[in-house]
């Protein structure tokens, strides 16, 4: 309910299948090998140049979004840790 803080989760060593930049690389969607979708909004400029192969973990929260009647779980990335 209102005021309830979502738990922060950490995905260690994510197996990234592909990524997609949108809105002039301000935002990025990572698709994991499992099919899970991870979203990074307002990514810092220095992250754009870093290799996805060096990503150690994603930190964020799980959210359910609905678009045109279709519900989808997304992991909303708040922080990326690199090796």
What are these regions (language model features)?
Residues 1-83:
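Acidic, two-metal ion nucleic-acid-processing modules in DNA metabolism proteins
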